[in-house]
Amino acid sequence: MIATPDDYSWFSPERFPGLADAYCFTYVRGLTPEEVVTRLGVRVEDCSRVTLDGLIRRQTFGAVAVGDWVLLVEASSGLGITEEIITPLSAGTRLVSHFYLDVDGMDYFYWIDDGKIRFEYAYQEGYSHWIKDGKIQFMFRHHESYSEELPDELAEILERIDSPVYPIADPHEGPAFLLAERLTGITMTPRLLEESTYLCGVVPGSR
């Protein structure tokens, strides 16, 4: 059963200080943490294994395997929404990411398949696709980085986001988690974040 927006109220600054108000979660399918780190230009031998607290203190990224996916967790960083990074990182596979920065009220969401953007939420622009007249429609100006395929598999989630029960909320308030779950099959939980050990590194030139 897919979660509802209210199911993510646990992800709060009170429980996750230093993360919930400035985070980026990125999911990459079919790779290992070591392969993801290598694609990011980081030498595996320069990485270390850390807990979530250690990752937050370092304000860097950490990678952990979750089933067939790798989850990248970032504190106060936005590699997962930098198109110059995530477009090549998605080569031959699927990448899903979402980002929030509380101080600016800034939300972003990406779904990329093999270098082509399938769906996006952009700060101050909104969703790239929405349901109008019962159909998924493209809302942004088209450019070559976008896939021509419509993200029909998201129709149910978009309808729920815009339902009378769950009125439209900012992505970080639940919709981004719902969309990521639909696209990856992974439900974000406190246990997943708190009990994982992360392969932690620094991307060259990111600081």
Residue ranges and their predicted role:
Residues 4-5, 10, 119-121, 125-207:
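Long, compositionally biased intrinsically disordered terminal regions
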Residues 1-32:
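Short, extreme N-terminal leader segments that mark the start of a protein/domain
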Residues 35-43, 88-89:
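Short amphipathic alpha-helices in soluble, non-transmembrane regions
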Residues 30-39, 81-83:
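Short, conserved charged micro-motifs
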Residues 18, 48, 97, 188-191:
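Residue-level signal for secondary-structure boundary elements
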Residues 48-123:
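Short, intrinsically disordered low-complexity segments
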